[in-house]
């Protein structure tokens, strides 16, 4: 049965006439993935608008769920779109504003804050709760905030499909749905989502239950929406940020967590001596758990970009014990970074054991990453599938069948500046 849709729209031209263009936002981007986006379930708390403002300051799009009935301090009422969406110009910091749209519902309110004036603001009626969608014609994309039904997320598939249909109906080729799906990504992937849908997730718990419920589903194909779980801001959900591994002249810091253990790659005891083991260890905020990527060229064997994975602590590069003579089971370590051409090793940068490619064997889960050593063709692996602190990171042949092996699967999380 066709779902009834109630659509309301705010034209970009009217927004301009009313002086709604945000200040403090970014310049128009060339592609959908150049938008930095985030999602957070506020759990209705009126006092959580301050946390939402901090998240919005770091992102061009913020999707919110369980939004309180009262608007935030510093929000100037602009008008009502249709009967249910209130529009505010929201001052979130000195000289920085966001366009805030709150959709009032009989269940839980939704909101979206943007650094730009949307082309349209649309309510899409759902089986249980609606979706709130904004369009960005400049980037050929629509963004939507959803809060799926509790328990089993039975309405996820139709909500995502409706957003995709509404975006396509407006001549937009791309769409992204963010929110609380009340369903883990592993279950969401089995729902019969649109054929081009991808699930951008952090691989970590986002709710106090220990489940991962907050993420993004989109048809955009990119490595630039890596997910990071932010600090708790008073809700029973954590905010999730989506941003690039590479940005500007200085690559951002990142952490790398193993899917089998939820622990981070860590330079043993913060030692900066050549040959120091790389292990897994629980997150402690230390600099020896932070890394940077340096693009180094293209792999001749796979066609993928090669990266140096550099320790933020020592500036040394991830390498493998015994270098080009290494084999199955040799441990990963840090070492003085080689020259771009692989010197002092031989064979040029294609034979340099400090060069890794990021592989995504499951196209529908683009943040799930394998770290492949370009010289040896072997993969970073948590030895013996150990889940405890101190386990060695070794290299090993790939083990993935239908799905990648958890101890060879990693998530890369850009570090969030304003925590």
Locate the predicted segments by residue.
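N-terminal, active-site-proximal structural segment of metallo-dependent hydrolase catalytic domains
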Residues: 2-9, 18-91, 158-160, 236-238, ...
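Active-site regions of metal-assisted phosphoester/phosphodiester hydrolases
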Residues: 30-55, 105-250
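Residues that flank catalytic or metal-binding motifs in active/ligand-binding sites
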Residues: 33-36, 106-109, 128-130, 139, ...
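Soluble non-cytosolic domains of exported or imported proteins
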Residues: 42-47, 66, 150-154, 259, ...
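Residue-level marker for beta-strand->alpha-helix junctions and adjacent short loops that shape enzyme
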Residues: 69, 182-184, 188, 272, ...
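Substrate-binding cleft of extracellular glycoside hydrolase catalytic domains
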Residues: 73-117, 121-128
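Extracellular glycan-recognition/adhesion modules and their associated mucin-like linkers
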Residues: 248-272, 290-326, 346-387, 405-419
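Aromatic-rich beta-strand patches that line glycan-recognition/binding surfaces
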Residues: 276-282, 330-336, 391-397
């Amino acid at each position: 049965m066709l779902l009834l849709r109630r659509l309301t729209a705010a034209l970009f031209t009217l927004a301009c006439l009313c002086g709604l263009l945000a200040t403090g936002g970014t310049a128009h981007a060339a592609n959908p993935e150049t938008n930095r986006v985030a999602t957070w379930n506020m759990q209705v708390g009126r006092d959580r608008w301050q946390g939402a403002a901090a998240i919005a300051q770091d992102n061009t799009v913020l999707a919110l769920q369980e939004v309180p009935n009262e608007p935030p301090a510093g929000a100037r009422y602009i008008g009502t779109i249709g009967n249910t969406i209130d529009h505010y110009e929201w001052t979130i910091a000195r000289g920085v504003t966001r366009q805030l749209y709150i959709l009032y519902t009989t269940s839980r309110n939704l909101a979206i804050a943007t650094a730009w004036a949307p082309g349209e603001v649309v309510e899409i009626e759902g089986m249980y709760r609606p979706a709130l969608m904004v369009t960005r014609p400049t980037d050929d994309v629509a963004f939507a905030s959803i809060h799926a039904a509790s328990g089993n997320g039975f309405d996820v598939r139709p909500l995502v499909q409706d957003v995709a249909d509404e975006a396509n109906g407006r001549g937009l080729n791309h769409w992204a749905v963010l929110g609380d799906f009340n369903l883990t990504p592993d279950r969401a992937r089995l729902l019969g989502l649109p054929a081009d849908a991808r699930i951008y997730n952090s691989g970590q718990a986002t709710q106090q239950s220990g489940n991962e419920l907050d993420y993004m589903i989109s048809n955009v194909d990119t490595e630039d929406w890596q997910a990071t779980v932010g600090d708790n801001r008073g809700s029973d959900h954590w905010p999730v940020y989506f941003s690039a591994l590479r940005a500007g002249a200085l690559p951002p810091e990142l952490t790398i967590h193993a899917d089998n253990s939820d622990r981070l790659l860590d330079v043993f005891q913060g030692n900066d001596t050549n040959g120091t083991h790389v292990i897994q260890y629980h997150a402690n905020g230390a600099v020896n758990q932070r890394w940077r990527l340096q693009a180094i060229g293209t792999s001749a064997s796979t066609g993928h970009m090669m990266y140096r994975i550099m320790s933020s602590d020592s500036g040394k590069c991830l390498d493998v014990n015994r270098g080009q003579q290494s084999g199955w089971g040799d441990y990963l370590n840090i070492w003085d970074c080689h020259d771009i051409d692989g010197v002092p090793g031989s064979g040029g940068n294609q034979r340099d054991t400090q060069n890794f490619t990021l592989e995504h064997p499951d196209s529908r889960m683009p943040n799930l990453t394998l770290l492949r050593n370009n010289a040896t063709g072997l993969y970073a692996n948590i030895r013996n599938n150990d889940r405890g602190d101190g386990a060695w990171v070794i290299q090993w042949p790939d083990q993935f069948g239908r799905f990648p092996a958890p101890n060879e699967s990693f998530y890369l999380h850009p570090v969030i500046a304003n925590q």
